[in-house]
Structure formats: C-alpha cells, structure tokens
C-alpha cells in the first residue's frame, strides 16, 4: 500500500504534502460540535484567576516580571511596514499586527503562558494539601522557606524540543522543585545550557520530540512525588495558553479594532504539537465565536496537525505515515504527531492550516528584523505568511468570498512565539543565512 493511502487524505493534498510544497488547507470541519471533554467557561476563568493571584509571586521570583506586576503579557505591535512590503498580488488588505510573545519575560516564548500556569497549579495544590496556603493566602507564601522545602521533595519532569522545557524549568527550579527536562535531538545547545545554569537536569535524547516526551513519561511513572507535564495532553498547559485571548481582546479594543460580523479577526499561529495554538484559539472562540478565523502554521516537513485534521479523526496519525522526515530548522515545531487534546478541539475550531518551508522561515525571520525590528528564532516566524495566504491565494480568496468577508475590514494578528532569549550570535547566524539565501534567489511565494 502506498505511503499515506490509509490516512483518508485527499490525494491532491497528500501529493502536495509529500512534495514539501507550501500549502493552504481549509478545514471543512470548522463549526462542528465540540467534544464532551472541552474545557468549560469556568475552567477558563479559573486559569485566568490563577495567573492573576500568582502575579505577586512571579514578580518576587523574577525581576524581569516586576514591571508588569508579575502578569504574563506581551505587546501587540502594529505591522504596517510588513504589510506594505507584501509583494503585488499578495495580501494588502486589513490591519496587521504582531503579537509579541517572543518578548515574554523569563521564558522568552509563548510557552511561558502554559508552562507557568501548570507549575503554579501544581505548587498551589501541594501547598494547600500540606497546610502551607489556603484559598485567600498571598501566593508569595509559595516562595517561603517552608514551601521551598516541601517542593524540594517533589520532581517536575517534562519532554520538550526546547521552549516548553525552558518555561517549566525556569519556574519549577525557582520554586525549589527538582526539575528534569528530557530534550529531543532538535533542541538547541543554548537552551540546554540555560537550563543547566539554573540547576535543571537535562536529559538529552538522540530521537525526536515524541521519543523525548515518551522517555520522560515512562521515567515519571516510576517515581514517587513526580509530576509529568504532558505536552501531548495537558489541560493545565492548554488553559494557560487560552488566557492569552482576553489579553489580546483588550489590546485590540485599545487599538480601536472591533471584532464582529463586519470586522473579522484572523489569527495566524505557529504550531508544533498543537497545545499553544489550540489553547489560544479556544480562548478566542469563547470570546468572539464565529468572528475569529484561526490558521495554524506548520513546517512542510512536520505538518502534524494538518495531517491529523485532514485525515481520519478516530486514529492518531504521524507525518512519518505520509513519508515526511520531520527535519526542519524550526526546532520548536519539529513534531511528528499532534496532541490528541489539541487536535480534537482544533478540528472543530480552526479555519485551516498552512505550511512553510525552511527557506520561507528564514525570509520571514529577515522581514521581521528589517521591517519591524524584531529578532525571532525560525519557528517563531512560521506564521508571517498567513495574511498573504488568505488574501493572495485562490483558496484564501474563496474562503473570504464564501463567508462574505470584506478583506479591508479584517484584522490580522500574526503570533510571534519566541526569540528574545536567543543568544546574539545565533541571531546573527540566522540573519546571515537568510541574507545569503535571498542573494541566490529569495524564498519563493
């Protein structure tokens, strides 16, 4: 049987994916009922409340968070220069913004939202169970000597390609937990080094992301007092990401950008295993319903969410199943199989997915530097082509026409997911590579 035949993928889509051709796929399942296990409005409110009541604790632990009072928040930057630079025939309509999660303090990436939320939920649970905190206790008590001594009896473990490990590792170690991060072969050396300087135990694996996660899961299962942060299925991570929706809504309101039937919101999100974009989309759908149109961006070598959404929902599928190799410079997106939790929710809520090759990643990275003054890591630039796909491709224009959307009235938010902690020499290397490829022919459409 040919590779991919059993996945129930459209033959034309399968051929595009197997050829590594950048592709826009529109989700025919958008609007279907949510699964029974979908988070509730109370779950979303609880997550937001947790991050707010722990803000003082975070500000005490990390000087970088004191200017925000400990709140995990990033700027919304207008991207008019990027819009003006879009080539003829591509997206020129609507208002463009970049959501700067690359600038989130401490962890330097979108993973701070989910990772911090899960660690804080664990710390609260342990502290309350042992009489160290109650419902009304100032959460700065979780940094006390007594709390740290209690946390030191517990291990926090996670598998990661890099950024989630940084997020979990930075906060868990700061609270006194023994912290172990299993990192895949894709993880960058500087991320491992940064964790080790914080006293985090880094376990390196020769395999991919899924193998690192599985190794961590199996080790944690045999250890007492060990909490495994499961990036493939954690509701706490998912809910932490979802809290970004209210933050974005407030920023759009301040910018005078309404979101309603006449003024749709398009959100373009880099996607690895799916938890971060899935959570953000879930939060935005809770606020705006059908007026938000979310597209996830994946490497051509690793479109795990696209493969899962476009195929049979009943069976987990991997990019290896269609003959792809999961090898990309976008280390944070080098994931072969989607989170079952995120995929089930994105199936009902995502408008679609598009793929980007490594040449495009570096072209977008250079555009971010030259047009907006933003230094990103390659995976964080994956979604920069989103507005062009919507207004500059046949499939994108068909999507707009089918919904009666006026492109000029739309707001596009491109999520930048990481880069502020990347060492300067790495940024120079990224940009030199991007300039070299531009000199020999550019990145294509």
Curated annotation (Swiss-Prot):
One of its GO terms (molecular function) is pyridoxal phosphate binding. InterPro entries: D_Ser_am_lyase, Ser/Thr_Dehydratase, TrpB-like_PALP, TrpB-like_PALP_sf. It comes from Burkholderia pseudomallei (strain K96243). Its EC number is 4.3.1.18. Keywords: Lyase, Pyridoxal phosphate. It catalyses: D-serine = pyruvate + NH4(+). GO terms for biological process: D-serine catabolic process; isoleucine biosynthetic process. The modification N6-(pyridoxal phosphate)lysine is found at residue 111. Its cofactor is pyridoxal 5'-phosphate. Belongs to the serine/threonine dehydratase family. DsdA subfamily. NCBIfam families: D_Ser_am_lyase (TIGR02035), PRK02991.1 (NF002823). This is Probable D-serine dehydratase.
